Amino acid sequence: MIENKINKLKELINKYNLDGYIIPKNDAYFAEFSSPDRLKIISDFSGSAGFAIILKKKNYLFVDGRYTLQSEIECGKYFKIIEIPKTLPKIILKKLDKKLVIGYDPQLFTSINLKKLFGNSCNLSAIDSNLVDKIYKEKPKKYVNSFYNLDANITGVSVSNKVNR
């Protein structure tokens, strides 16, 4: 199943004239629990932090030390697992033959984050629509959590005062 999704994504990578595509764990709001969890969709990785770079010939999953073993078990067959911050993508991409064009969803990254991760190691290309969304037909339900008001004696200000600011 993972292999099929990766292959479909690689077809889109070719269609968009890219050398690769970045898939983060976060959503557009940088929420810890995101829906859809595109990283899990493409890799089956269920940890709460990480990102993947799918290249034409190699797939990388970047995780912090908490998830090294877990990621090997869940998706090590299809991804080279890289522990961050020991190794950043820019170090790996600089070792490749040419300067790659890597696509990304601009709603899921900040320019500061991209610069930190990739530096000048590749050419980054913002793609209008998320490529994982294009291949994934069974959209999961949106993660929705209820919200509630806390009393002003806890927060120091009432909801109406805060909204009116």
Where are these regions (language model features)?
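Ligand-binding face of N-terminal immunoglobulin V-set domains in extracellular IgSF glycoproteins
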Residues: I102
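N-terminal accessory/capping or targeting/presequence segment of soluble
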Residues: M1-D97, D105-F109, N113-R165
